[in-house]
A protein has these predicted regions:
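Short alpha-helical transmembrane interface motifs in multi-pass membrane proteins
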Residues: 81-85, 100, 112-116, 143-147, ...
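Short hydrophobic alpha-helical segments within the ABC transporter permease transmembrane module
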Residues: 71-76, 83, 118, 161, ...
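Transmembrane alpha-helix boundary and packing residues in multipass membrane permease domains
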Residues: 29, 102, 131-136, 145, ...
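Short helix-capping/hinge motifs at transmembrane helix termini and TM-loop junctions
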Residues: 36-44, 105-109, 134-140, 152, ...
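Glycine-rich helix-loop "coupling/hinge" segments at transmembrane-helix boundaries
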Residues: 135-137, 149, 164-165, 206, ...
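Residue-level hotspots within pore-lining transmembrane alpha-helices
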Residues: 80, 122, 126, 135, ...
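Gly/Trp-centered helix-boundary motif
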Residues: 1-98, 102-103, 109-110, 124, ...
């Protein structure tokens, strides 16, 4: 995309109030996560066993968990892990999926058939086994976990991008560019990528909360974040287990996650409209 298209997209995005509100919430969450060590009332590992499972109070605004750890502090610290795994894993998925989909869709023929059969095979493999193998081979590592989650989330993006590229490559403007001798790299950059950024943006905003919950599931299996560290996924999992007795342990992490989900959806929809060259 040239500078004019980027400027137009930024202008359209700035005129979308819902997208701006979603973006503001996301920026606020990122700032809170980054400043968690300074703004959190307590450390994420601090325990006051005499006040275990206490409801919200003046000292513990959102209450404590069964081990007497401040829930507000754990939500703030958990935001660092959840947002990081969300953005990093989604970034890995986008890089692999977009590249795979563009190559398969643009080249077509036997190459497309082979590449998409590989995608179909990978869809049938249990991702848990893949992640366990990575952990066994390379050892438990937080960044490896992020990369592993991204490596199993790219398949849908590859299919989406491939379908978009197949629909675009026979359009008149693409055929004209080919006739003028435009290189494949320029074709991708100037004609294909600008027209698929909208669907990519929407899928990315849907993938981020999905990988957040996936991280919580992996932590439950002992493959993800380990105590005393926390993420929103692990907090929600713990809250579900004790929701009948201590409902606040699920309500507040759930509200935080829901607000993040809506903010991502608002911002993603705005990005889709702003990046659509037809608007």
């Amino acid at each position: 995309m040239n500078n004019s298209l980027w400027s137009d997209a930024l202008y359209r995005l700035s005129r979308n109030r819902a997208a701006m509100f979603g973006g503001f919430i996301l920026i606020l969450l990122i700032i809170c996560a980054a400043l968690a060590p300074w703004i959190a009332p307590y450390s994420y590992s601090y325990q006051n066993l005499s006040l275990g499972a206490s409801p919200p109070s003046a000292d513990y605004l959102l209450g404590t968990d069964v081990l007497g750890r401040d829930l507000l502090s754990r939500i703030l610290y958990g935001a660092r892990i959840s947002l990081l795994v969300g953005f990093v894993a989604t970034g890995v998925a986008l890089i692999i999926g977009v590249s795979w989909g563009i190559i398969a869709g643009y080249i077509g023929g036997r190459v497309d058939s082979i590449m998409m059969r590989i995608v179909d095979i990978l869809y049938g493999l249990p991702f848990i086994i893949f992640i366990i193998l990575l952990m066994v081979i390379f050892g438990r590592n937080l960044w490896l976990l992020f990369g592993a989650i991204g490596a199993v989330e790219w398949l849908t993006m590859a299919r989406i991008v491939r379908g978009q590229v197949i629909g675009l490559k026979n359009q008149e403007f693409v055929m004209a560019a080919k006739a003028m001798g435009v290189s494949n790299i320029s074709m991708f950059r100037r004609h294909l990528l600008p027209n698929i950024l909208g669907p990519i943006a929407v899928y990315a905003t849907l993938t981020i909360p999905q990988v957040m919950l996936l991280e919580g599931f992996l932590s439950f299996l002992g493959l993800g974040i380990q105590p005393p560290m926390s993420s929103w996924g692990t907090l929600i999992k713990d809250g579900v287990e004790s929701m009948e007795e201590f409902s606040w342990l699920l309500i507040y992490p759930g509200i935080t996650f829901t607000i993040t989900l809506f903010a991502l959806n608002f911002f993603g929809d705005g990005l889709r409209d702003a990046l659509d060259p037809k608007t």
